[in-house]
Design a protein with these regions (language model features):
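Active-site beta-strand termini and strand-to-loop segments that position acidic
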Residues: 99-101
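Short amphipathic alpha-helical segments
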Residues: 53-55
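Short hydrophobic/aromatic beta-strand micro-patches
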Residues: 58-61
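Active-site phosphate-binding and catalytic loops of NTP-dependent enzymes
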Residues: 80-88
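Long, contiguous binding/interaction regions
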Residues: 1-48, 64-72, 76, 89-91, ...
Length: 135
């Protein structure tokens, strides 16, 4: 291994702010969906199902505008909790918006797409979190 290469490698410092727990942030995202009239809101505890993420937040919006609002307001709430979105998919099409926060993934569906993919059935082994009680 070339030691010159090693000396040019830089490290990224951890953020100076403190993020709240993944469970708390997932519940905050669920509450934001509810506050913006999202329907059929679920928080799934994914820790026993996959090592990739801890929680899924799943909700349904009835229109493109509502789907965008839930996604945008969820992102603002996650930022307020000290989190940074790592990626987003599906915003333009507005059928299924996926926001990746590393340990929390927020899914906002239109009704037909949610019915087609049935994530809660696909991940039926994941325990459901009583997010309203947790908040």
């Amino acid at each position: 291994m070339n030691t010159a290469t090693l000396s040019t490698v830089s490290t990224v410092s951890a953020p100076s702010h403190t993020t709240s727990s993944a469970l708390h942030r997932a519940c905050v995202a669920a509450k934001v969906a509810a506050d913006n009239k999202g329907r059929d809101i679920l928080v799934l505890d994914m820790r026993s199902c996959t090592p990739l993420y801890d929680y899924f937040v799943i909700s349904t919006g009835s229109s493109r505008r509502q789907i965008h609002t839930v996604a945008e307001e969820s992102d603002a709430a996650m930022r307020a909790e000290g989190d940074t979105r790592m990626g987003i998919e599906g915003y333009e099409a507005s059928k299924w918006v996926v926001q990746d926060y590393g340990d929390v993934v927020v899914h906002v569906f239109d009704p037909d797409t949610r019915d087609y993919y049935k994530l809660e059935e696909l991940w039926s082994d994941a325990p459901r979190v009583d997010w309203e009680r947790e908040i």
